[in-house]
Structures are given as C-alpha cells and as structure tokens.
A protein has these predicted regions:
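Accessory nucleic-acid engagement/destabilization modules that flank
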Residues: 1-156
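Conserved adenine-nucleotide phosphate-binding loops and their immediately adjacent elements
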Residues: 159-168
C-alpha cells in the first residue's frame, strides 16, 4: 500500500499566490527520487460539458457556474510549483497532479475526449475509481519521507525557473 510515513499537506497555500492545493502527498519513487502527488478534491456530483477549453459547468454557490476542469486546475498547481519553486527545480522533484471527485458516479463528462489533453497531464478519478486513485499514488510514491519533501517545498525560495525565464 501507500507507505505509513508518507508526507501529507492539506490545503497548502502556494506562496505569493491565493491558490490552495487541497492535498499534497510526498515521498519518493522506486528510484528514490523525491516526488509529490497533488490531489484536487471536488465534492461535485454532476458536471456539464462546454465547448470551451478546460471549462466545465457545475452547480456551485446556488447556481450553475463555468469553472476550470479539475484536471486542468491540478495541472496548473503543479506547473506553478515547477515554474516558481526553487527546491522543486534544483532537486528535480517530480510533481504528479490528479483530481478526485468523490461524489461523482458518472464519468462521461469529466473524462470526455474534449478534455483529453488535460486528463493526460492530470487524470480525474470518480467515486468508483478509489482503487485507480490509490494505484496512481502508489505508482509515484513507493517510499515515505516523514514530510521531508513537503518541508523542503514549503521553505523554498520562490523564483522563476530558467526554463520559464528563457520563454519570457
């Protein structure tokens, strides 16, 4: 299973942003390489397809709203850490995003081919996918780290990566 001494951070605020990552699980992979799994948690039970890239409709705050697809959201959090967290860059920490919609029973819309590009970067798991979610976590985290990777990420300096700076 998932190691008992795996690091866990709940509602982690990405420094110098208003973004919060619902769940981060840390450890190392089979090659002892530091890794983190980002899990975007959604309570949604239903979503509707839109023609817009990375956008779904769901019932939120008393009405139907257009919101980011959770896979896209999880991937953007991973990209923020990869692009601006010095420790993630220098220690080459692997960031593996996914989304878990624990109340959703029908996957037709959330896993629709319209969102394929985002699902490939960060898979979405629904209520019946708990075993697949566990397998995803175990695939990336074979050994626990007693929170060491999360501690390193949290105390890291924030600066643009060379890759990002080269693009600008």
């Amino acid at each position: 299973g998932i190691p008992d001494d795996t690091g866990v951070a709940i509602e982690y605020r990405i420094p110098q942003t208003s973004k919060r990552i619902d769940l981060i699980i840390t450890g190392s992979d089979e090659n002892k390489k530091s890794t983190a799994v980002i899990v975007e948690l959604k309570q949604w039970s239903d979503v509707k397809l839109t023609s817009k890239d990375a956008i779904v409709k769901t019932y939120l705050g008393g009405g139907e709203r257009e919101v980011n697809h959770p896979s896209y959201q999880a991937w953007t959090y991973a990209a923020l850490l990869e692009d601006f967290n010095e420790v993630v860059q220098e220690q080459n920490i692997a960031i593996n995003p996914c989304a878990y919609l624990h109340n959703m029973v029908n996957e037709d819309v959330i896993k629709h081919s319209h969102y394929q590009e985002h699902l490939e970067k960060a898979p979405s798991f629904i209520k019946s996918d708990t075993e697949k979610l566990t397998d995803f976590i175990k695939q990336h985290i074979r050994f626990g780290d007693a929170g060491k990777v999360m501690f390193e990420i949290d105390k890291s300096k924030i600066r643009p990566s060379k890759n990002l700076a080269d693009k600008l």
